[in-house]
């Protein structure tokens, strides 16, 4: 016979609080890597498409995650993620000059 699972630890924070925290973190990171005007236009597109709904919040989270992932994968010039450090040092030391 099936039984309900026992209470396993503290209650997780509500989904909407967690979702808004994630959105704020992604927005802060996106502003460091993309033009504000471009992000504003993206926000306007999401608002026009979804209105002021949770579906819109989830959509913009998904899009920002994908954009930041691709940005880092290609090789962000704002961080060391995706950059070959040896190439970076050679350029700084002038080793690539002919």
Swiss-Prot record:
An example Gene Ontology CC term for this record: host cell
Ranges for region Homooligomerization: 1-42
Pfam families according to UniProt: VPR
Cell compartments where the protein resides: Virion; Host nucleus; Host extracellular space
Role this protein plays: During virus replication, may deplete host UNG protein, and incude G2-M cell cycle arrest. Acts by targeting specific host proteins for degradation by the 26S proteasome, through association with the cellular CUL4A-DDB1 E3 ligase complex by direct interaction with host VPRPB/DCAF-1. Cell cycle arrest reportedly occurs within hours of infection and is not blocked by antiviral agents, suggesting that it is initiated by the VPR carried into the virion. Additionally, VPR induces apoptosis in a cell cycle dependent manner suggesting that these two effects are mechanistically linked.
Note: HIV-1 lineages are divided in three main groups, M (for Major), O (for Outlier), and N (for New, or Non-M, Non-O). The vast majority of strains found worldwide belong to the group M. Group O seems to be endemic to and largely confined to Cameroon and neighboring countries in West Central Africa, where these viruses represent a small minority of HIV-1 strains. The group N is represented by a limited number of isolates from Cameroonian persons. The group M is further subdivided in 9 clades or subtypes (A to D, F to H, J and K).
Protein name: Protein Vpr
């Amino acid at each position: 016979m099936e039984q309900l699972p026992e209470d396993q630890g503290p209650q997780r924070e509500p989904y909407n609080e967690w979702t808004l925290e994630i959105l704020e973190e992604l927005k802060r990171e996106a502003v460091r890597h993309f033009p504000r005007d471009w992000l504003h236009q993206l926000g306007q597109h999401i608002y026009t498409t979804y209105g002021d709904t949770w579906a819109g919040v989830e959509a913009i989270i998904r899009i920002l995650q994908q954009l930041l992932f691709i940005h880092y994968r290609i090789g962000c010039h704002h961080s060391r993620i995706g950059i070959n450090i040896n190439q970076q040092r050679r350029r700084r030391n002038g080793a690539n000059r002919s």
